Amino acid sequence: MSKKLYIKTWGCQMNEYDSTKMAELLHSTHGYDVAEEAEDADLILLNTCSIREKAQEKVFHQLGRWKNLKKNNPNLLIGVGGCVASQEGNEIRARAPFVDIIFGPQTLHRLPEMVNQVSETHAPMVDVSFPEIEKFDRLAEPKADGASAFVSIMEGCSKYCSFCVVPYTRGEEVSRPVDDVIYEIAQLAEQGVREVNLLGQNVNAYRGEHYDGEVCRFAELLHLVAAIDGIDRIRYTTSHPVEFTDDITEAYKTIPELVSHLHLPVQSGSDRILTMMKRGHTALEYKSKIRALKKARPDIAMSSDFIIGFPGESDADFEATMDLIQSIDFDMSFSFIYSARPGTPAADLPDDISEETKKKRLQLLQQRLNQQSMAHARRMLETEQRILVTGPSKKNPMELTGRTENNRVVNFVGQPHMIGQFVDVRITEVLPNSLRGELIREEADMGLRVDTAPEIILQRGKSSEPDELGVVRMPRQAS
């Protein structure tokens, strides 16, 4: 009977990606299969996020639920990873001594050694170091789970925005070698993946090395990914306006695989607040980048993030944010009331805005964003949209569901063989959280672009032998 692994994941898409890699890694080295419930597991991992308020207390609350499982099964191993573990490792050891393994986002690749050592010595382990690119060298081969996949191309952030904890929990920017990224995507394409979402805390700051030492910038990487046959959609998240350079804008003119949707967080429309946030750009510079992008790709849909109630935010600052929203006309966006993150510069600023004011501003801002979002959805009525079919609809299993380029969910009547393929539909109804469509054509009638077959990329380097833990390292091209 195989050993069971249960992973609970909180936070961003990068954490989701990391959890997938943990499961693949521990399956390849120790034979762990994923359990649906913590009660059935031999190893429980909590992958944490420190972005939201009271993140630490949320962790201890969850660990308290698992404490009895450990008491009833002394052989059960419990590990805590992610950004809270990186930030609060010693506190976790002190308040939850029954936790066996504490690891950071950059040391998840060492999980097999940690599991071995804890099993042998019965002594807890803590490793929240920042060993840079080593993490990616030790990952198991990717396994596709559907037609869309996440691929991490870099880690960390070097922008040090005053409100953000990421540089302190995930470290500064480290880019994967470009050949490793392309090889992983080719492996996924071989398994039927049609859409990749390139991940990074500051993804458009990517500076990965080729095997010959030459540096590949993000725009060049987009061209290389688009050339892989089978990859017909490229998304990426999360971007920073400062790193959104002209060559990336130009890529939207020449790469049809790049979806007509961009998430570009701005946080505020006030130059004064942007300066206090240490964002490195003005509202006008942000608008200028969007104008250039819409000139390159007129139908592009924009989304963003907004922080409300940052320390010192005046009525005028808030109105500047509302004006920016009005001028950009976002397709959809995310907004949050500011909460101080321990250890960040902004945490030392006085919280001089009442909760009532914060909530009122958030309500007004979300009302405007929702109005814009619904207006965009209504404009899609009776239009033809290409969607990637991801599976049966959650609300009606007799229907299929997929996403448009601008990330809208569409449900329609179709056949099971369409799952994992593209179809064109006519939008027939606009609902609050989704769209309905009517099938127009299937993928066989589309004539999608064909370029470099994945097997050609995979043949460029043969996999090395598994290491002592059974991990096959990513092959590198020889010069």
Curated annotation (Swiss-Prot):
Q: Indicate where this protein resides in the cell.
A: Cytoplasm
Subunit structure as annotated in this protein's UniProt entry? Monomer.
| Domain MTTase N-terminal intervals | 3-120
Cofactor binding mode and count: Binds 2 [4Fe-4S] clusters. One cluster is coordinated with 3 cysteines and an exchangeable S-adenosyl-L-methionine.
**Cross-referenced InterPro entries, in alphabetical order?**
Elp3/MiaA/NifB-like_rSAM, Methylthiotransferase, Methylthiotransferase_CS, Methylthiotransferase_N, Methylthiotransferase_N_sf, MiaB_methiolase, rSAM, rSAM_horseshoe
Matches recorded under PANTHER family: CDK5 REGULATORY SUBUNIT-ASSOCIATED PROTEIN 1 (PTHR43020), MITOCHONDRIAL TRNA METHYLTHIOTRANSFERASE CDK5RAP1 (PTHR43020:SF2)
Give the catalytic activity.
N(6)-dimethylallyladenosine(37) in tRNA + (sulfur carrier)-SH + AH2 + 2 S-adenosyl-L-methionine = 2-methylsulfanyl-N(6)-dimethylallyladenosine(37) in tRNA + (sulfur carrier)-H + 5'-deoxyadenosine + L-methionine + A + S-adenosyl-L-homocysteine + 2 H(+)
Ranges for domain Radical SAM core come to: 143-375
GO cellular component annotations of the record: cytosol
> HAMAP family under this entry?
tRNA_metthiotr_MiaB
Binding residue positions for [4Fe-4S] cluster 1: 12, 49, 83
Tell me what this protein is called.
tRNA-2-methylthio-N(6)-dimethylallyladenosine synthase
Q: Which cofactor does it need?
A: [4Fe-4S] cluster
Spell out the molecular function terms from Gene Ontology.
Answer: 4 iron, 4 sulfur cluster binding; metal ion binding; N6-isopentenyladenosine methylthiotransferase activity
Its biological function? Catalyzes the methylthiolation of N6-(dimethylallyl)adenosine (i(6)A), leading to the formation of 2-methylthio-N6-(dimethylallyl)adenosine (ms(2)i(6)A) at position 37 in tRNAs that read codons beginning with uridine.
Q: Does the keyword Iron-sulfur apply?
A: yes
Q: Tell me the name of the encoding gene.
A: miaB
Q: What is its EC number?
A: 2.8.4.3
